[in-house]
Amino acid sequence: MIYGVGTDIIQIARVQGVMERTNGRFAEKVLGPDELAKYHARKARSEKRGLAFLSTRFAAKEAFSKAIGLGMRWPMTWRAMELMNLPSGEPTPICHGELAAWLAERGLSVRVSVSDEHDFAVAFAIAERAGGAASQPTAL
């Protein structure tokens, strides 16, 4: 049953600007250790592909945080979720620490799709609850 959906789009030039202003530290803030290693490998081959990778991961984390209904609030942190690829190429979120426990307590799994094209990176996430009812809207 669908628990929540999230989407995000970012202009790759904005990420490039942040990287320039932070002397590259933005990647270290946003990417988990496995993502960071993959980012450096891609960047070594092509600056443009490295930037696209970073942008898709940023968008994926934003979309993921929206799908689970937390936004970027604890236990959802930049490095608590890494988006890696299965051997088939399918992107799969790997959650760590308290975020993994939070998702398990609620019986949630999340699927993420990412894409980039020249100027933009986009991500879409669907959070699902196994066998449970869909989340109900919360009155504000």
Curated annotation (Swiss-Prot):
Catalytic activity: apo-[ACP] + CoA = holo-[ACP] + adenosine 3',5'-bisphosphate + H(+)
Name assigned to this protein: Holo-[acyl-carrier-protein] synthase
Alphabetical keyword list: Cytoplasm, Fatty acid biosynthesis, Fatty acid metabolism, Lipid biosynthesis, Lipid metabolism, Magnesium, Metal-binding, Transferase
Residues the record lists as binding Mg(2+): 8, 62
Main location: cytoplasm
A Pfam match: ACPS
GO biological process: fatty acid biosynthetic process
Class of enzymatic activity (EC top level): transferase
E.C. no: 2.7.8.7
A Gene Ontology term for the protein's cellular component: cytoplasm
Family note: Belongs to the P-Pant transferase superfamily. AcpS family.
Function: Transfers the 4'-phosphopantetheine moiety from coenzyme A to a Ser of acyl-carrier-protein.
Gene (name only): acpS
SUPFAM superfamilies with a match to the protein in the record: 4'-phosphopantetheinyl transferase (SSF56214)
MF (Gene Ontology): holo-[acyl-carrier-protein] synthase activity; magnesium ion binding
Domain of life: Bacteria
Locations listed in the record: Cytoplasm
InterPro entries noted in UniProt: 4-PPantetheinyl_Trfase_dom, 4-PPantetheinyl_Trfase_dom_sf, ACPS, Ppantetheine-prot_Trfase_dom
Keyword Lipid biosynthesis: yes
Cofactors that this protein relies on: Mg(2+)
Keyword Magnesium attributed: yes
